[in-house]
Amino acid sequence: SSDAAAVLRGLNALTGTPLTPMELAELGGAVGSDVPYCVLGGTALAEGRGEVLTPLPTLPPCTFVLCKPTFSISTPQLFALVDAVKLRARPDTAGLVAALKAGDLAGVARRMYNVFGDVLPERQRRTVEEIRAVLLSHGALGASMSGTGPTVFGLFDDEARARGAWEELKESFRDTFLTSRV
């Protein structure tokens, strides 16, 4: 998706920027569901297949630890499983948006929830939960799987605690990263 967005933006620049960012995002929606977001960037609420975007305020200063397990996940398979099962819970999207608008980092973290975690195969779910447990044990305000996974992220208000989680996780998972919001 990010590659497609870069190509669209590059072609737009090469042709004298005839399309607005919103027009480019709409065009990107025909290529893939995540392309509009990658064209526009920033913080946004994605609805529909991910192509309907509402800009939101940026998170307050924070640090993230991202950890990608070695297994892969089939996005179509997970969507089929979500459609086939009764979900235990749903994210509090309205509450999360309100917390973002209020600049309440802890409120955002409390509302992080990913329904795809509920339908992961048992072995993969166990790995995701182990990573979440490490992040939370180091003081993450919240931890969740990103999208259809398998990357798991933790949201921290303290860089030293985030660094501790990163140090522990990188011993077991090569693709573990420490970063802050831009």
Where are these regions (language model features)?
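Conserved glycine-rich beta-strand-loop-beta hairpin in the small C-terminal domain of fold type I
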Residues: 150-152
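DPxDG-like acidic metal-binding loop motif
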Residues: 1-21, 37-41
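Conserved, helical-rich catalytic subdomain that frames metal- and/or nucleotide-binding sites
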Residues: 49-142, 157-170, 174-182
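Active-site glycine-rich loop that binds ribose-phosphate moieties when present
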Residues: 26, 30-31, 46-55
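Phosphate-handling active-site elements
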Residues: 10-27, 158-171
